[in-house]
């Protein structure tokens, strides 16, 4: 990464590319016990959060990610009541989950409290649900939390993590997925951010392989635009305990949802279930 001439530029080595934002000033910086968190004011994208020099979110486009890691899984499950979010310290995913009135509890477990405190200060619009009676915010190791989660107690596990390095490295392996598998009920769904399908299909395949080793039987990777991330195209991957799951969703409920979204719709959900040919071929779909 580099900062020069009022631009913040993140270099992405796997594709020999970069993404940049014009900035008007640095608002804050905190070194937590786990990582460095920085907040910048941009000229066109609102506020920008970096973690260890990598772009995490902007005010302008975070809705793509937060909606797609939440609503497809919640509308795919027949009746989700208990949701666990591992990571998600900016609280945007928690906000989207708790838009669903049928959800009775949502526990967010992020290892770094400072991410949440910075989000509350600089991205308060993401933290609307933090004081919802159904919300529980924990600041602990997500790997340990899932290992100790009672068997068959959770409907959906959302892994809203940073890239598979540093504090998030343990969230991308068989042992962690085994804990998720154990905690989920029979109709439960695991959903995890799965990087760029344009640049990192090998990593997505590795994730799905590790999930399969842990017992998951069916997988579906959903691509979506994410302008602030490398390549501008991102994905989430859903995993089911059920063999040959088709990931059909409650289309009527999605069409009649009683809350606003900026990107997710029932029609979009239908379309995103059909992977582009090069993605389908690489993932064996």
Curated annotation (Swiss-Prot):
Domain of life assignment: Bacteria
Location(s) in or outside the cell: Cytoplasm
Enzyme class: transferase
EC number, as in UniProt: 2.5.1.16
Pfam families in the cross-refs: Spermine_synt_N (PF17284), Spermine_synth (PF01564)
Active-site residues, record numbering mapped to chain: 160
Alphabetized SUPFAM superfamilies for the sequence: S-adenosyl-L-methionine-dependent methyltransferases
Domain PABS: 5-241
Key words of the record: Cytoplasm, Polyamine biosynthesis, Spermidine biosynthesis, Transferase
Disulfide bonds: none
GO process terms (BP): spermidine biosynthetic process
Quaternary state and interactors: Homodimer or homotetramer.
Annotated protein name in UniProt: Polyamine aminopropyltransferase
């Amino acid at each position: 990464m580099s900062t020069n001439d009022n631009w913040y530029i993140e270099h992405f080595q796997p594709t020999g590319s970069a993404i940049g934002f014009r900035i008007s000033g640095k608002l804050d910086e905190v070194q937590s016990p786990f990582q460095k968190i920085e907040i910048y004011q941009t000229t066109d994208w609102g506020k920008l959060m970096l973690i260890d020099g990598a772009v995490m979110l902007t005010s302008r486009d975070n809705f793509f990610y937060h909606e797609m890691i939440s609503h497809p899984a919640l509308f795919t499950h027949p009746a989700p009541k208990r949701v666990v979010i591992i990571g998600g310290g900016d609280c945007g995913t928690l906000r989207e989950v708790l838009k669903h009135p049928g959800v009775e509890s949502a526990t967010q477990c992020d290892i770094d409290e400072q991410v949440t405190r910075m989000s509350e200060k600089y991205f308060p619009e993401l933290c609307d649900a933090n004081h919802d009676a159904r919300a529980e915010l924990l600041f602990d190791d997500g790997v340990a939390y899932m290992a100790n989660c009672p068997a068959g107690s959770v409907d959906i596990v959302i892994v809203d993590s940073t890239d598979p390095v540093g504090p998030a490295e343990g969230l991308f392996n068989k042992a962690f997925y085994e804990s998720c598998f154990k905690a989920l009920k029979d109709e439960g769904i695991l959903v995890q951010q799965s990087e760029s399908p344009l640049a990192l299909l090998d990593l997505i395949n590795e994730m799905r392989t590790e999930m399969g080793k842990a017992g998951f039987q069916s997988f579906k990777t959903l691509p979506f635009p994410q302008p602030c991330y490398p390549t501008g195209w991102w994905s989430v991957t859903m995993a089911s305990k059920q063999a040959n799951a088709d990931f059909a969703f409650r289309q009527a409920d999605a069409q009649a949802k009683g809350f606003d979204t900026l990107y997710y719709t029932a029609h979009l959900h239908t379309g995103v279930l059909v992977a582009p040919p090069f993605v389908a071929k690489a993932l064996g779909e």
